[in-house]
């Protein structure tokens, strides 16, 4: 069987996804004891893994370096890539929200300034609502923007809401629910069809059995 390379994102999503691969019989012991390594071979299958930044997973898949990728829906929404989205894995679930300080008025007619790491998603959301906003792109912690007067509100991913609460912010609007997705390179789906669909189908059955 041909080797299948899977790109995973480092961090929180990685911890959610490794058990799913183990449950379908793919050894992930090297991933659990990785040290500083970034490339790993499963000991019992033709699967190898690479660990990259979340924003780069879809790029590796699009260019064929990885056959399969696991990435948050937020990355796919913000960065349009020429890939196939195969499965909603139902893990890493959170929401895009509009949040701000308690005095924020979402119904105000004046042009608002919105700070976010996700300018495309944010501009599309407000455009669809018919609202003209100024988008301020921030790479770091966006929660501070309303506190310092840089922005009227923020758009960010919210899981528990604890970070917002600790910074005195509240959620005003829930925009989109997001979760981890399995994506596939278009060319690989033709050249490695059997191997890829074997993983996709087993993963789908595992997800359905867990519901």
Curated annotation (Swiss-Prot):
One of its GO terms (cellular component) is cytoplasm. Its main location: cytoplasm. Gene3D superfamilies: Periplasmic binding protein-like II (3.40.190.10). It catalyses: 1-(5-phospho-beta-D-ribosyl)-ATP + diphosphate = 5-phospho-alpha-D-ribose 1-diphosphate + ATP. Pathway: Amino-acid biosynthesis; L-histidine biosynthesis; L-histidine from 5-phospho-alpha-D-ribose 1-diphosphate: step 1/9. SUPFAM superfamilies: Periplasmic binding protein-like II. It is found in: Cytoplasm. It holds the Pfam family HisG. It is an enzyme of class 2 (transferase). One of its GO terms (biological process) is L-histidine biosynthetic process. CDD domains: PBP2_HisGs (cd13595). Keywords: Amino-acid biosynthesis, ATP-binding, Cytoplasm, Glycosyltransferase, Histidine biosynthesis, Nucleotide-binding, Transferase. Catalyzes the condensation of ATP and 5-phosphoribose 1-diphosphate to form N'-(5'-phosphoribosyl)-ATP (PR-ATP). Has a crucial role in the pathway because the rate of histidine biosynthesis seems to be controlled primarily by regulation of HisG enzymatic activity. Lacks the C-terminal regulatory region which is replaced by HisZ. Heteromultimer composed of HisG and HisZ subunits. This is ATP phosphoribosyltransferase. It comes from Bacillus cereus (strain G9842). The lineage of its organism: Bacteria, Bacillati, Bacillota, Bacilli, Bacillales.
């Amino acid at each position: 069987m041909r080797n299948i390379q899977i790109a995973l994102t480092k961090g929180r999503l990685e911890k959610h996804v490794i058990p799913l691969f183990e449950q379908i019989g793919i050894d992930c012991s090297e991933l659990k004891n990785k040290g500083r390594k970034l490339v790993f071979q499963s000991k019992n299958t033709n699967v190898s893994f690479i660990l990259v930044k979340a924003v780069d997973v879809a790029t590796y898949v699009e260019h064929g370096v990885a056959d399969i990728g696991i990435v948050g829906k937020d990355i796919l929404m913000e960065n349009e890539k020429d890939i196939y989205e195969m499965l909603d894995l139902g893990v890493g679930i959170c929401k895009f929200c509009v949040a701000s300080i308690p005095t924020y008025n979402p119904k105000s007619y004046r042009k608002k300034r919105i700070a976010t790491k996700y300018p495309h998603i944010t501009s599309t959301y407000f455009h669809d609502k018919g609202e003209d906003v100024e988008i301020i792109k921030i790479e770091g912690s966006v929660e501070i923007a309303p506190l310092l007067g840089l922005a009227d509100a923020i758009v960010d991913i919210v899981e528990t809401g604890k970070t917002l609460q600790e910074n005195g912010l509240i959620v005003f609007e829930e925009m989109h629910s997001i979760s981890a997705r399995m994506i596939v390179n278009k060319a690989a789906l033709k050249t490695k069809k059997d191997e890829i669909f074997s993983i996709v189908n087993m993963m789908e059955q595992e997800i359905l059995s867990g519901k």
